[in-house]
Amino acid sequence: MNPGPSAAIDDELWALVLGLQRHAAVAGAAPTEPVAYRLEPRWGLSPLQPDEHRGAVLIQDPDGRWRCGPALAKGRRAAARPLLRLYLPLFSTTLAPGWTVAHLGQSLDGCIATHSGDSCFVTGVENIRHLHRMRALADAVIVGAGTVVSDDPRLTTRLVPGPSPVRVIIDPMRRLADHYRVFQDGAAETLLCCSHEHAGARVRHGQAEVVPVATKAGSLDLIGLKSELRGRGLRRLFVEGGGVTVSRFVAAGAVDRLQVTVAPVLIGQGRPGIVLPRVSSLSEALRAPAQVVAMGEDTCYELDLGTARSRPDANSGSKSESKSGSI
């Protein structure tokens, strides 16, 4: 598959996001008053004087959050504003210690692949390009062993400008052979995370480093895994799949933002996306602030799970007045 040019965000605006990434890496605390910035072709973000705010592409508020400036309100740039809202929160000072974003692409009936595991590709070119951008913004991209077997992914940023992240493969029992591309191509640093029991004496798996992680209830302790990665300076984590891995991260409360991109296709009895423990009533369901972004023919739903966990009424929602469904 060869994704074509993106209609939603062009090279100039992606350069803006990468400029913000460089700026955030060296910036200090949030400003005491709003600060507006323009994009300099050679130098990245440059602050503006208060009387120049009309030309601002980005504004940082005293709460540390970023928003689109007036210069992105009209013309072709305006079409990119919804998509930029997926990226701007990642540079907020409230997420400065690090963030974990999980993503799944699925069919309208909730499947990420056919029953045989064919998943290339459920979503369209816009979402594939978005995945590569998210990799470029992350320190590490995380996938489970099932994704490696089904897709043999490279997990690089070959479709967009930007650095490829460290590749983290979760394989608790170390069952994967070492012939997959992530273990052999040398395109990026790669970590194979498994249990202490299965780490063995070998410290390498192909070209990947073997990293033993504590287990919990038969699976890797994901909070412990995140701690191990933080100790290596990997604080911005992108969990790219598959359904089992993303579901476990969500169930463990280890995800700040969850992105689910839905394609207008019906797969039938395929492999499910998010699978969480059962709840008895809708009042127990996880409800979170959300935004919706169009990606070509697909629709991306992003849930702010970090905010949902911090709200005492996060799981409360409207209930029907009767069992008949009347409201």
Task: Indicate where each model-derived feature is located.
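Enzymes that bind and transform nitrogen-containing heteroaromatic metabolites
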Residues: 1-327
